[in-house]
Design a protein with these regions (language model features):
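A short, structured surface patch at a secondary-structure boundary
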Residues: 30-90, 187-190, 200-204
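Boundary at the C-terminal end of the N-terminal hydrophobic targeting segment
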Residues: 22-26
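Bacterial N-terminal signal peptides
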Residues: 7-17
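Glycine/small-residue-rich loop that forms an oxyanion/phosphate-binding "nest" at active or ligand-binding sites
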Residues: 91-108, 113
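Basic- and aromatic-lined ligand-binding clefts that recognize polyanionic substrates
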Residues: 28-46, 131-185, 198
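Structured C-terminal subdomain patch of bacterial secreted/periplasmic proteins
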Residues: 30, 93, 113-129, 219-272
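Positively charged n-region of N-terminal signal peptides that target proteins for export
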Residues: 1-6
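Extracytoplasmic/secreted envelope proteins and their assembly/folding machinery
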Residues: 36, 40-43, 74, 78, ...
C-alpha cells in the first residue's frame, strides 16, 4: 500500500469527520429548559421548540414544569438533565447557582429595558447553541421592527403608557422597553420614574387620575384588549384621549411586538 494512498485515506477521514461535526452543530440542538413563556416564544421563532425539554409553570407547552424565574424547581430541573437553562436576569445569580446542575449552562437574558435586547437575546442563544441556521430570522426581526417603528409617526405627542386600568396598574418610564419603543416611534413619553411606576394606595401616585394630572399627556395608552369600567372612572383636570391596545402584543418581550407595531401604524391617524 503506497504512502500516497494511505495519506489520501487519512485526508478523507479527517474531511468526513469535520463534515459530521459541522452537520451536528447545524442540525442538532442541546436540551433546553425555558423558564418563561416569552423565552419559549423566542425559541419557537428561532425554530428550536423541539429542543425544549422543560418549561415554567406559566407555559402552554405540554412539558415538565420547572417552576418560575424567581423560584426554579431544582429537583425537576436536575431530572431533565438540561444542557442549557435560559432564564431572565431577574433570577439572581445565587438562585441560579443553587438550582443549576453542574453540567448545565445558564443564560440570563436582559429583555425589559431596550428593544435592541430582543435581537441581542436571539443572537446570544444562537451562539450558545450553535443554531446558526436561525441567523436570518434574527436579521428579519431586526429589520422588520426598525422599519415598522418609523412608520408610526408619533408626532411628539405627549403620552403615558399604562399596563391597565384595573388591579395594580403601572406606568412605563425611562429604561423600560416600551418607553424605548414609543420614543423611537416618535412619541414623547412623559413618565419620569425609571423602569415602572406602581400606582396604588400608599405610593407616591395613588391613582391614575393623579398620574394624568401630574404629567398632562395628550394620549393615554392602556395595554388591555378593551377598556375596563375603571378606565371610565378616570376624571383628570385636563381631558385626555384614552387608547386601548391588546397587552399580549406589547407587554412581553417577544416577536408579537411586530403585530403591535402594525396596529399602531393602522391607528396613526388618531394622533396626527
Amino acid at each position: 500500500m503506497s504512502f500516497r494512498y494511505i495519506f489520501s485515506l487519512i485526508l478523507l477521514y479527517i474531511s468526513s469527520t469535520f463534515i459530521s461535526i459541522s452537520h451536528a452543530n447545524s442540525s442538532e440542538c442541546p436540551r433546553i429548559i425555558s423558564q418563561s413563556p416569552y423565552i419559549t416564544e423566542m425559541l419557537t421563532y428561532l425554530g428550536m421548540q423541539h429542543c425544549i425539554v422543560g418549561v415554567s409553570r406559566y407555559d402552554k407547552l405540554d412539558l415538565p414544569r420547572t417552576g418560575g424565574i424567581l423560584d426554579p424547581d431544582a429537583e425537576t430541573i436536575d431530572t431533565l438533565m438540561p444542557d442549557i437553562i435560559i432564564t431572565s436576569d431577574w433570577a439572581t445569580k445565587e438562585t441560579v447557582k443553587l438550582t443549576t446542575p453542574k453540567t448545565a449552562k445558564v443564560i440570563r437574558l436582559k429583555s425589559f429595558y431596550k428593544m435592541i435586547q430582543l435581537e441581542e437575546n436571539m443572537a446570544t442563544v444562537i451562539k450558545a447553541t450553535h443554531w446558526v441556521q436561525a441567523t436570518p430570522r434574527v436579521t428579519a426581526f431586526k429589520q422588520a421592527w426598525r422599519k415598522k417603528v418609523k412608520q408610526v409617526h408619533g408626532n411628539q405627542k405627549k403620552v403615558l403608557l399604562l399596563s391597565s386600568c384595573s388591579g395594580t396598574p403601572y406606568s412605563f418610564g425611562p429604561d423600560s422597553r416600551l418607553y424605548d419603543l414609543f420614543t423611537q416611534a416618535g412619541f414623547k413619553v412623559v413618565e419620569t420614574k425609571e423602569k415602572i411606576r406602581h400606582i396604588r394606595p400608599g405610593n407616591e401616585i395613588e391613582h391614575i387620575t393623579a398620574l394624568i394630572d401630574l404629567y398632562q399627556p395628550d394620549l393615554l395608552f392602556i395595554f388591555e384588549q378593551r377598556l375596563r369600567k375603571q378606565c371610565q372612572m378616570i376624571t383628570p383636570k385636563v381631558p385626555v384621549s384614552i387608547l386601548s391596545f391588546d397587552g399580549k402584543l406589547f407587554l412581553q418581550p417577544n416577536t408579537e411586538i411586530l403585530k403591535g407595531l402594525d396596529i399602531l401604524i393602522q391607528n396613526k391617524e388618531r394622533w396626527k
